[in-house]
């Protein structure tokens, strides 16, 4: 009896491995949410528009590969807000001068509600957010309360104009885990990529007739 139980256990373990291997292959065969977001942006947001993009995509995401746009200084399709530099230190204090270079893992520590005021004032009307960044903040809100307040301000002052989910219909979102955001092991995933949301701010220069 014991050998039979061992054999059954081995079959079940192998079967589980096959299920997850097939699932992962199927997920990776589908369009990535970041590509879906870019396709929507290319169809709906004119070239040279000022946009804010969280560091959830490569820098080339804002460019048409092999076709540099002549209307921007670096050839990118859109003008990106400089999220890689900030005047906010990791402890929330304000730095003088040109600020500092922001490591990707520290991005959420640079967010605060006043950024939304700046976006509206300067015409950065589209904000592209991804769960591989926002999820960091929501997993440890006590460490980055200003980031949580930033997302609340963004949601209250902007419309969601595009959303792409990596989850299958009816599935509960996976609790934030940085590794699972890239290997898609949980069966809730239907396609690769983070949850992507594009916001359009409503006020300031982003209001109708505001000039942005």
Regions found by a protein language model. Name each.
Residues 16, 26, 33-212:
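C-terminal luminal/periplasmic domains and tails of membrane-associated envelope-modifying transferases
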Residues 1-21:
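Signature aromatic-anchored transmembrane alpha helix within multi-pass, membrane-resident enzymes
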């Amino acid at each position: 009896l014991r050998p039979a139980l061992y054999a059954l256990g081995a079959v079940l373990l192998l079967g589980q491995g096959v299920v997850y291997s097939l699932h992962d292959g199927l997920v990776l065969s589908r369009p990535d949410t970041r590509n879906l977001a870019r396709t929507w942006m290319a169809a709906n947001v004119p070239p040279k528009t000022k946009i804010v993009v969280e560091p959830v995509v490569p820098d080339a995401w804002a460019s048409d590969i092999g076709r540099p746009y002549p209307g921007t200084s670096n050839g990118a399709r859109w003008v990106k807000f400089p999220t890689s530099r900030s005047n906010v230190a990791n402890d929330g204090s304000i730095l003088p001068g040109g600020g500092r270079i922001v490591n990707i893992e520290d991005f959420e520590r640079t967010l605060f509600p006043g950024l939304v005021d700046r976006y509206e004032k300067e015409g950065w009307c589209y904000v592209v957010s991804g769960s591989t960044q926002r999820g960091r903040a929501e997993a440890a809100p006590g460490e980055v309360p200003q980031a949580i307040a930033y997302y609340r301000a963004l949601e209250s002052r902007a419309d969601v104009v595009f959303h792409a989910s990596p989850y299958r219909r009816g599935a509960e979102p996976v609790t934030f885990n940085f590794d699972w955001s890239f290997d898609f092991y949980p069966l809730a995933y239907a396609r690769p990529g983070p949850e992507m949301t594009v916001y359009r701010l409503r006020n300031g220069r982003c209001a109708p007739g505001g000039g942005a």
